[in-house]
Amino acid sequence: LDARIKSVLDNGQYILGKEVNLFEENLSQFADIKYSIGCSNGTDALILALMALDIGPGDGVITVPFTYIATLEAIVSVGATPVLVDVYDSTFNINPEEVERAINNSKVKIKAIMPVDLFGLPARYRMINEIAKKYDIKVIGDAAQSFGASINNQKVGSFADITTTS
């Protein structure tokens, strides 16, 4: 490990270097997904996900209040409006019933749902994805606390349109 770190420090390629490419390939293979992009931090990953989906001023993003500040910071950074919904008392993960209620009652056009997986437990993505499909909304999974978990042999990273981790 020390030799690998020294190699990165010696060649000065912190961005787009061979180690980053290897990391992205390994991450994709581990999560059984097609692509991975290394970012400097989880906040930047969330911002890039929102930008990739062309989310900005006038758009709403449904998420939860029980999260690290980066979730809301990313939404506001692109000019979108956070639309907060309640979580399950038992898991603190987003409640899909509240998501659908928020979509129907929102004053802004909802363009994405951003579940935040907590304590190693992925959100209820099957239900969330059904709602997203019904309303033609994208799902951005924040898997900073669940990466490595799986449900029915499907790895976190493969449940949403875009998943971020840090």
Language-model features: where?
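Conserved PLP-anchoring active-site segment centered on the Schiff-base-forming lysine
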Residues: 47-105, 112-114
